[in-house]
């Protein structure tokens, strides 16, 4: 007689083993209709799985995050059902859940086109709308293998042979004539899988190994209702409009080319943004009492072996040789900073020592993973390393947290998710050291009033870590900032200081990044602002346009004066109609459009418009300059009179 305890503490007693669906039906028909799965004693189970003993139970519906993941996974199986009907020779590989959707890797000689994807989606919807039941069967390893061997599913056979023990009992999910294998759970009926869309198809190697066959990966998105699906599709449409690669080309910010894959060619206006970011971060470094250093791009392999990076990152490092010595271009700055720390005897009085660098790093990322500014091979990190005593860790981490939030708020990012990764199973040091380290990070977060999620076991072997993930205007997550404790690298590279008792001690090292990669952060900003940078960041802050040739000298005089006042200004003296000029510079997202005619020239004024079309009227030159300079100095996100 299992006693089932529900989330509200109420209990229901059953005479025989009972499923989650049975419990839902016992509560009411509405809940039974909405039931997708159950969380039994904390573990997700199919709605049909029997509960034999007393248990706690949460009933999962499409409104729950777990329910959404389950229906997405079932949509991947639905894709398999449909593609096998349209192209029976297809061999199915893997079909996992991803953010907002799913994909399925398939082996099909026919190269799928956009029309094929549309036909596949149509067949999926036709099948789903029959609201057929999904039937689960738990079988022996041999029966599962025989099932897939009989269907010619070589990839499923490989998964069984290589990844599943022979004494295991795999679960097979039957979608009418189609059968798939999965840990589950899955929806009990396809009525839950009506709101999806296939998005794209791309190439993907089996098991991610370029030595294996290239498969076709079909991506889809799925949601619990039509409104949520349409909201997501609208968000994707807006994201496409904001694509930094498209806007970067429109605004002539940068380009990339085949001869330097993953490397950025910064054009004048893009480099202006880059330098402005550097200037801003330098102000922060000064405010928080950092030194700025510069290390070499390339160092001997011996150093990378001592640091431990050669063992872990060799495949991602660009290397070269000279005079019988092997060198690696740095993928990160930390070993170089330890070398600077090691120059000269350090005392406890010198700590904390905060060392920052705009370090130019290179990593040999796979060519298929490169994506505009978001995933590159050459990048600049706003990297810093703090050498301190263990007693100073909490205070230093707390300052890092304040610096992160100060910085992000300047750009308008207020929705920041913080995660603390704690000790992994394989780690250096004893439990006391990890207790102190984790407590220091937790206390620093609490002291700053920061809500955070703990990720047990996700820390590095050498110390716990805080990650800062910002959410943009489209609610996309971008992991940028990190604060990582390191109890290993200083010792590996011989860093010591003289403690108060004159003994040599190894400092704790705090790795700290705020923007992360400047290139990537600029990509994020382009998409966040849709190219409409706040005035302080905009490559051109004001453009002055004449109506006739009579005002040309006055325009040139104004531009010269603006530049002297620290305003990035340009002029447009072309023999074009003023409306044409205004439209063109509006499309280039210039914050202020200044028009000069005879009257403005006579009165030593300018007619001021914003790129949003707001007419600010006529202003004196001094009033405009004073207002814009104040706006720039405060790094305001808004234009005048917004």
From Swiss-Prot:
UniProt-listed SUPFAM superfamilies: Class II aaRS ABD-related (SSF52954), Class II aaRS and biotin synthetases (SSF55681), TGS-like (SSF81271), ThrRS/AlaRS common domain (SSF55186)
GO biological process: threonyl-tRNA aminoacylation
Record key words, sorted: Aminoacyl-tRNA synthetase, ATP-binding, Cytoplasm, Ligase, Metal-binding, Nucleotide-binding, Protein biosynthesis, RNA-binding, tRNA-binding, Zinc
A GO term from the CC aspect: cytosol
Protein residues bound to Zn(2+): 334, 385, 511
Pfam families according to UniProt: HGTP_anticodon, TGS, tRNA-synt_2b, tRNA_SAD
Known EC number: 6.1.1.3
Region (Catalytic): 243-534
Compartments where found: Cytoplasm
InterPro entries: aa-tRNA-synt_IIb, aa-tRNA-synth_II, aa-tRNA-synth_II/BPL/LPL, Anticodon-bd, Anticodon-bd_dom_sf, Beta-grasp_dom_sf, TGS, TGS-like
Catalytic activity: tRNA(Thr) + L-threonine + ATP = L-threonyl-tRNA(Thr) + AMP + diphosphate + H(+)
NCBIfam families: thrS (TIGR00418)
Annotated family: Belongs to the class-II aminoacyl-tRNA synthetase family.
HAMAP family: Thr_tRNA_synth
Name of the protein described by the UniProt record: Threonine--tRNA ligase
Gene source species: Shewanella amazonensis (strain ATCC BAA-1098 / SB2B)
Gene name tied to this protein: thrS
């Amino acid at each position: 007689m299992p006693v089932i305890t529900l989330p509200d503490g109420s209990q229901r007693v059953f005479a025989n083993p009972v499923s989650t669906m049975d419990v839902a039906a016992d509560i009411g028909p509405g809940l039974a209709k909405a039931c997708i799965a159950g969380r039994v004693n904390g573990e997700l189970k199919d709605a049909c799985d029997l509960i034999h003993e007393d248990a706690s139970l949460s009933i999962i519906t499409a409104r729950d995050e777990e329910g959404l993941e389950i229906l997405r996974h079932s949509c991947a199986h639905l894709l398999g059902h449909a593609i096998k009907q349209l192209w029976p020779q297809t061999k199915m590989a893997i079909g996992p859940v991803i953010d907002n959707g799913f994909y399925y890797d398939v082996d099909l000689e026919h190269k799928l086109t956009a029309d094929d994807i549309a036909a596949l989606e149509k067949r999926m919807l036709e099948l789903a709308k029959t609201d057929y039941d999904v039937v689960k069967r738990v079988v022996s390893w041999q029966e599962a293998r025989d099932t897939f061997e009989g269907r010619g599913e070589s990839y499923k056979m490989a998964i069984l042979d290589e990844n599943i023990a022979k004494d295991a009992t795999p679960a097979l999910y039957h979608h009418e004539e189609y059968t798939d294998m999965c840990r589950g759970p899955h929806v009990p009926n396809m009525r839950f899988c009506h709101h999806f869309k296939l998005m794209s198809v791309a190439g993907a190697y089996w098991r991610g190994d370029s030595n294996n066959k290239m498969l076709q990966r079909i991506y889809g998105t799925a949601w619990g209702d039509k409104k949520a699906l349409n909201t997501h599709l609208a968000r994707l449409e807006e994201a496409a409009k904001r694509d930094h690669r498209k806007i970067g080309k429109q605004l002539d910010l940068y380009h990339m080319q085949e001869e330097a894959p993953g490397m950025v060619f910064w054009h004048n206006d893009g480099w202006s943004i880059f330098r402005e970011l550097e200037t801003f971060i330098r102000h922060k470094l000064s405010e928080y009492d950092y030194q700025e250093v510069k290390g070499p791009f390339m160092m001997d392999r011996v150093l990378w072996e001592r640091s431990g990076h050669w063992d872990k990152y060799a495949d991602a490092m660009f290397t070269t040789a000279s005079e019988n010595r092997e060198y690696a271009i740095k993928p990160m700055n930390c070993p170089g900073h330890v070398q600077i720390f090691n120059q000269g005897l350090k005392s406890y009085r010198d700590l904390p020592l905060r060392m920052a660098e705009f370090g130019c790093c290179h990593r040999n990322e796979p060519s298929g993973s490169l994506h505009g500014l978001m995933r590159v091979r050459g990048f600049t990190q706003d990297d810093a390393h703090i050498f301190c005593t263990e007693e100073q860790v909490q205070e230093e981490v707390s300052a890092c947290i304040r610096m992160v939030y100060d910085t992000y708020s300047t750009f308008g990012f207020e929705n920041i998710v913080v995660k603390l990764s704690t000790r992994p199973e394989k780690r250096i040091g004893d439990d006391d050291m990890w207790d102190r380290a984790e407590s220091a990070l937790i206390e620093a977060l609490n002291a700053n009033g920061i809500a955070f999620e703990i990720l047990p076991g996700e820390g590095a072997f050498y110390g716990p870590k805080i990650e800062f993930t910002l959410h943009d205007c489209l609610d996309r997550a971008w992991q940028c900032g990190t604060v990582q404790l390191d109890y290993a690298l200083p010792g590996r590279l011989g860093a010591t200081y003289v403690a108060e008792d004159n003994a040599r001690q190894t400092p704790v090292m705090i790795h700290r990044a705020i923007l992360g990669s400047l290139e990537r952060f600029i990509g994020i900003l382009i998409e966040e602002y849709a190219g409409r940078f706040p005035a302080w960041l905009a490559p051109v802050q004001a453009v002055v346009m004449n109506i006739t040739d009579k005002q040309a000298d006055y325009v040139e005089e104004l531009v010269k004066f603006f530049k002297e006042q620290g305003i990035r200004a340009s002029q447009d003296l072309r023999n074009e109609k003023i409306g044409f000029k205004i439209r063109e510079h509006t499309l280039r997202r210039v914050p202020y459009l200044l028009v000069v005619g005879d009257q403005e020239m006579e009165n030593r004024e300018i007619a001021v418009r914003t790129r949003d079309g707001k007419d600010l009227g006529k202003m004196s030159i001094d009033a405009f300059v004073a207002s814009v300079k104040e706006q720039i100095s405060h790094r305001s996100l808004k234009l005048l009179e917004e």
